[in-house]
UniProtKB/Swiss-Prot annotation:
Subunit details: The complex is composed of two ATP-binding proteins (PstB), two transmembrane proteins (PstC and PstA) and a solute-binding protein (PstS).
Name recorded for this polypeptide: Phosphate import ATP-binding protein PstB
Role summary: Part of the ABC transporter complex PstSACB involved in phosphate import. Responsible for energy coupling to the transport system.
Keyword 4Fe-4S appears in the UniProt entry: no
Residue numbers binding ATP: G41, P42, S43, G44, C45, G46, K47, S48
Family named by the database record: Belongs to the ABC transporter superfamily. Phosphate importer (TC 3.A.1.7) family.
SUPFAM superfamilies, sorted: P-loop containing nucleoside triphosphate hydrolases
Protein localization: Cell membrane
Organism: Clostridioides difficile (strain 630)
NCBIfam families according to UniProt: 3a0107s01c2
GO biological process annotation, one example: phosphate ion transmembrane transport
Chain ranges of the ABC transporter domain: 9-249
SS bond list: none
Membrane association type: Peripheral membrane protein
Length: 254
């Protein structure tokens, strides 16, 4: 019997406007649990705008209007006022590593402390588990009190991933998490993403076609604020349905 993948997030008829300018048009997408979904497309196509709707980061921008429905486990994220709880459940890792100017330990403990956790044993456990989960524990375990700003770019990005998973999210959003990293650091983060999907649902924006092909289970191709094609990654990269998808992934435009 074929197992049916559980839908973790569902997007229905999503429109987004910046003032009068429409940036996203009628987006429909089911994001499967414990899978990596890649968002690809040329610069300015709407993929970063889209990923930020998934944990309401666009709420911070003035003059934004959002129509349609986005749900996590069947619950509409835009009908609740509890944005903090949403961002606990749906974590985010940004393009440029952005560790806080504090120790490695305090970076990872920041979220749990903000939510009221003060017990040192529990914090120690969360910090260690999160750093192990982000595949950086062995590199930093002897210098947890050192500043996170003293780490390499690749290490800083893994600290940011550890900081995200310290909140025990269910979904991790990644907006071009390796674009500022060297090839070796990129490979480490890609290996980490492959490992993380056992416990988390991951949505990643990437400009790198090879990266999308390597690490994702499903891929959505965005163009001019629309999803042109959304399918399992192997199908998209071998037998795309839409000519525009084929033109993009073969490098005819971008």
């Amino acid at each position: 019997m074929e197992l049916i993948d559980k839908i973790k997030m569902s997007v229905k008829d999503l429109d987004l406007f910046y003032g009068d300018k429409q940036a996203l048009k009628k987006i429909n997408m089911d994001i499967k649990e414990n899978k990596v979904t890649a968002l690809i497309g040329p610069s300015g196509c709407g993929k970063s705008t889209f990923i930020r709707t998934l944990n309401r980061m666009n709420d911070l921008i003035e003059d934004v209007t959002i129509k349609g429905n986005i749900s996590v486990d069947g619950e509409d994220i835009y009908t609740s006022d509890d944005v903090i709880n949403l961002r606990t459940k749906v974590g985010m890792v940004f393009q440029k590593p952005n560790p806080f100017p504090m120790s490695i330990y305090d970076n990872v403990a920041y979220g749990p402390r903000t939510h009221g956790l003060r017990d040192k044993k529990q914090l120690d456990k969360i910090v260690e588990e999160s750093l192990k989960g982000a595949a950086i524990w062995d590199e930093v375990k002897d210098r947890l009190k050192s500043s996170a700003l003293g780490l390499s770019g690749g290490q800083q990005q893994r600290i940011c991933i550890a900081r995200a998973i310290a909140m025990r999210p269910e979904v991790i959003l990644m907006d071009e998490p390796t674009s500022a990293l060297d090839p070796i650091s990129t490979l480490k983060v890609e290996e980490l993403i492959e490992d993380l999907k056992k416990d988390y649902t991951i949505v990643i924006v990437t400009h790198n076609m090879q990266q999308a092909a390597r690490i994702s289970d499903e891929t959505a191709f965005f163009l001019n604020g629309e999803v042109i094609e959304f399918s399992d990654t192997k199908t998209m990269f071998t037998t795309p349905v839409d000519k525009r998808t084929e033109d993009y992934i073969t490098g005819r435009f971008g």
